[in-house]
Amino acid sequence: MSDKIKPSEVSEVLLQQLQGISQSAKFDEVGTVLQVSDGVARIYGLRNAEANELLEFENGTMAIVMNLEEDNVGCVLLGSTSGIKEGQVVKRTHRIASIRVNDNMLGRVINPLGQAIDGMGDIDLKGAFEMPLDRKAPGVIFRQSVKEPLQTGLKAVDSMIPIGRGQRELIIGDRQTGKTAIAVDTIINQKSFYEAGKPVYCIYVAIGQKASTVAALVQNLKEHGALPYTIIVSATAADPAAMQYYAPFAGAAIGEYFRDRGYAALVVYDDLSKQAVAYREVSLILRRPSGREAYPGDVFYLHSRLLERAAKINEQQEVAEQMNDLPECMKGHVRGGGSLTALPIIETQAGDVSAYIPTNVISITDGQIYLESDLFNQGFRPAINVGISVSRVGGSAQIKSMKKVAGTLKIDQAQYRELEAFSKFSSDMDAVTAMTLDRGRKNNQLLIQPQYSPMPVGEQIAILYCGVHGLMRNVPIDKVRECQDAFLEKIRSAHPEIIETLASGKIDNDISNGIEAIMQDIAGTFA
């Protein structure tokens, strides 16, 4: 052979290849499945696992660490237990349970892991923020007092139990009393803010509901044009208990994504009674000690740490940027002045608000809207018992015109209920009592509102002005609602400036005289 192999060249090539070899070995920390049952697995060998860390099984199923014991780790599965057997290998991911969030989620239905479940394809998560499911609530220094109203579009709520941005207002009542209807109407009412370029992003969390119920709700939101600013997080009754337990945390994490970037967000938890039941199920299978009604001892902490994440963030940029427990991905993107409002829903049994979970959540929230089946059956809908419903934020979450007009409405209605109880025993009454009773009955009629028809705040103030000042005294009780519709039709078409002025928070003698003149004309046709 003419070409001789030169040893020096061979050694040079080998040397170059050896220098390019990476000496770092890749280690995976793994454990083995000891036991698996009812959506919970025990794993041996993961001695460095952290609480709330994601684990991966051989078949790709994910799990979250909940129990850290001396010789094993208890984790809850976020999928089916089929295909998981004793002795299988489980891998640490070194990631704390989180959800990837971006604006492409708006209008979609997702599960608590952030995966689309609405059959419309995967969500483009390019540039998404990794938001932790469980996160410490903002400290006092990073918060601001609640003073901006969150308009629900419901006369009874906006006038007597006002909700502010950053507040936590509980909706409580028996089944079939219209709890979800109040929350859905509130979401639909945010449409005008979205169209005006000042969106309130809404997150509806469905916990343990039927898939058909969630589908009907999505269809309703779509029909009323509320989907473009709404995200639905759903863990249906068919999903594992762990998914139902983590669904509200996923909703809160999505809400924080908007809140920390300076936007207003609203999250509805429907309902937390089912989350508590799911948590009880998981805890008992993990053999945690049980307490009252077999709930684990930390069920209060479960709801308090979830609801404390609702807040109005300080408007000062330099303060907001220093917020505690800020995710790494959010640094540099924080804007002050954002808010997260929470509307948790609790279902009571036979009106018993003194049960364990209802009293817990009542004590955590900033007020409650109490719905009664008796009122619902009598046709007063929304069936709000104004006597025991309260908002601890009060008038500071109302615009000035609403505060001025509806300031006495709650006391007036309380006085009416008291007199009504006495009037059943007495046939003769003085003129003042008769007038108070008449006005109270008519105000009750004015506060009735059909579902899916939230009312703009300017129109609410105009009609409530008529009720509070007794401008309908000559209208028969059965014609009050017709009179209201005719009045609103007239004021919308002929005097839109009155509605605009009231909505801006102003009310003066000219506006009052204008309302009185219109109602006088309309009431005359019904008298």
Q: Where do the language-model regions lie?
A:
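Acidic-enriched and Gly/Ser
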Residues: 2-17, 23-26, 32-150
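Phosphate-interacting basic helix/loop segments used at nucleotide- and nucleic-acid interfaces
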Residues: 13-24, 152-157, 251, 306, ...
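P-loop NTPase nucleotide-binding/switch module
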Residues: 88-90, 97, 101-104, 117-168, ...
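Walker A/P-loop NTP-binding active-site region of P-loop NTPases
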Residues: 164-217, 271
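Loop/turn-to-beta-strand initiation segments
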Residues: 199-201, 228-231, 262-266, 337-342
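Nucleotide-state-sensitive switch-loop elements of NTP-binding domains
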Residues: 200, 210-254, 284-296, 303-308, ...
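Phosphate-binding/switch loop-helix module in NTP-utilizing enzymes
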Residues: 243-279, 331-332
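Conserved catalytic/coupling modules of large nucleotide/cofactor-utilizing molecular machines
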Residues: 274, 281-527
